[in-house]
Amino acid sequence: MIKYLIVGLGNIGPEYHETRHNIGFMTVEALARINNAPPFIDGRYGFTTSFSIKGRQLILLKPSTFMNLSGLAVRYWMQKENIPLENVLIVVDDLALPFGTLRLKGKGSDAGHNGLKHIAAILGTQNYARLRFGIGNDFPKGGQIDYVLGHFTDEDRKTMDERLETAGEIIKSFCLAGIDITMNQFNKK
């Protein structure tokens, strides 16, 4: 069975639950729920669960290292499960995209995101797939930290379930059809 590591970035703790910065956690939680995966288990460097589709095992990870040390969890679980870099997908919040916009990329810069920055530093490369989930940037100058650690608006919540489902479709397509086909299919939406 071919293994994939799907990492939703976020911060642990009730104060961060369902904040914009935790959209990665929310995405893998929704993917697990929709696919009837068992509950997440507290393991080394994170909480994991898995499910299989068409000969592929998707291992879902919510790092418990806090955002800025996410690379430790990614490296550990890649090594533990013997997963090659091309089978790793990081789900991350993105301030530069309007809320709900989803963009799959095969590589790229960290765009100022400390979780991605640490992953690149630990893995020694920026050449890993990431699914950027737009959280918008409707905040006053100097208000970025409060914004990303804030909760979604009622307006955002209206489309949240649909956007999380679409993110799950993108993740499954990444595992089944590959990144190029998936980017062509979904990045236009």
Curated annotation (Swiss-Prot):
Its EC number is 3.1.1.29. The active site is at H21 (proton acceptor). It holds the Pfam family Pept_tRNA_hydro. The keyword Cell cycle does not apply. It catalyses: an N-acyl-L-alpha-aminoacyl-tRNA + H2O = an N-acyl-L-amino acid + a tRNA + H(+). It is an enzyme of class 3 (hydrolase). PROSITE patterns: PEPT_TRNA_HYDROL_1. Hydrolyzes ribosome-free peptidyl-tRNAs (with 1 or more amino acids incorporated), which drop off the ribosome during protein synthesis, or as a result of ribosome stalling. Catalyzes the release of premature peptidyl moieties from peptidyl-tRNA molecules trapped in stalled 50S ribosomal subunits, and thus maintains levels of free tRNAs and 50S ribosomes. This is Peptidyl-tRNA hydrolase. The gene is pth.
